[in-house]
Design a protein with these regions (language model features):
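RNA-contacting regions in translation and RNA-metabolism proteins
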Residues: 1-205
């Protein structure tokens, strides 16, 4: 390939001391190219950069599936809400993944779990959820250190988003009351979760 390779004899003719297989670079004078060629090159480079950015975004959020993230409401539509992360990347919260009592205003910060990342024609689409059981589980992991530390295990979750939920927990340490630890003193731990979920009635059993 003459655009990617150069023969050893050609390099030596230029007075360069290179061995077979080594990389050789040469300065390109863009003034020798026409305007059309330069514009074409610019377009190709912009396209490649955009492609790499999309690949990086897909890889980044594929690793975040199942994690809670916070986004800023940018635009609300009838069927979905558009949020932006702290780098300006777009994320979608579909209507069916919203708690019925949720009401979003532009500029408001919203927490949700990354449900999945679609990749249609190399266009990453980050889908969020607030109705997923996993969202409730992650909230408990944040509010209850014993769950995050593995001292308490969430065995099952049943939920009608925005209305009620049952969370079954257990501990292998007899010194820990799993229900009491999840609820907290005077309900301090569970109240934050209840507020986040639009006052969903949560029973811990």
């Amino acid at each position: 390939d003459k655009d990617k390779e150069i023969s050893l004899s050609e390099v030596k003719a230029l007075g360069e001391d290179f061995e077979l297989g080594e990389e050789y670079s040469d300065k390109v004078d863009f003034l020798k190219f026409g305007r059309r060629a330069i514009l074409n090159l610019r377009q190709i480079l912009a396209s490649k950069i955009l492609e790499l950015q999309k690949d990086a975004l897909y890889a980044k959020y594929s690793e975040k599936v199942g994690q809670i993230i916070t986004g800023e409401v940018y635009q609300t539509w009838k069927k979905e809400v558009l949020l932006l992360d702290d780098e300006g990347n777009e994320m979608l919260l579909p209507k069916q993944e919203q708690i019925p009592s949720d009401f979003y205003r532009k500029g408001e910060m919203v927490r949700a779990v990354v449900l999945r990342v679609d990749n249609l024609n190399n266009n990453p689409k980050i889908i969020l959820s607030r109705t997923s059981n996993l969202f409730l589980q992650r909230l408990f992991e944040i509010e209850v250190p014993e769950i995050n530390d593995g001292l308490i295990t969430i065995k099952a979750i049943a939920r009608i988003p925005g209305e009620r939920a049952k969370v079954a927990v257990e501990s292998y340490d007899d010194r820990i009351d799993p229900v009491g630890a999840c609820v907290g003193m005077q309900g301090a731990r569970i109240h934050g979760i209840v507020r986040e979920l639009g006052h969903e009635n949560i029973d811990v059993i």
